[in-house]
Amino acid sequence: MTTRDGVQDSWGGPAGQQPHDKTYFLNLLGDSHTGLGRHEAAIEAYRQAAEGFKSQGAHCSYALCLWKVAESHLSLGEPWHALGYLQASLPLLHELGLTRHEGLAREQLAQCRSELTGVH
């Protein structure tokens, strides 16, 4: 996707925007918490980052944050929470052409549905 000006930076946000804003750091904080196995803290950081990216029009970063929230819920063994985030991220990942993440999200969504219905 492109911005109103038709230019995008490497983070999926409007070009010329400082990547070192609060939203950017919340995303990095979520990544750090994930790396340390602190998935609940990661979820909170990613959710806040997703809100910021959405308001900034950074569609790629927004979609990836939604997916990261789902990943964190799956790491906690909470497929019922991951389900909604996967469903929200899938159309965005598809639209943005993020095929690798879209494929992962589809697999995770199928796994969530399987776990929730008791069919393995």
Regions found by a protein language model. Give the residues of each.
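Single-residue signature of alpha-solenoid repeat helices
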Residues: 3-6, 42, 82
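Hydrophobic/aromatic packing residues within the alpha-helices of TPR/SEL1-like helical repeat arrays
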Residues: 7-10, 46, 53, 86, ...
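Short coil/turn linkers that connect adjacent helices within long alpha-helical scaffolds
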Residues: 12-19, 52-60, 92-100
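TPR/TPR-like (Sel1-like) alpha-helical repeat modules
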Residues: 79-97, 110
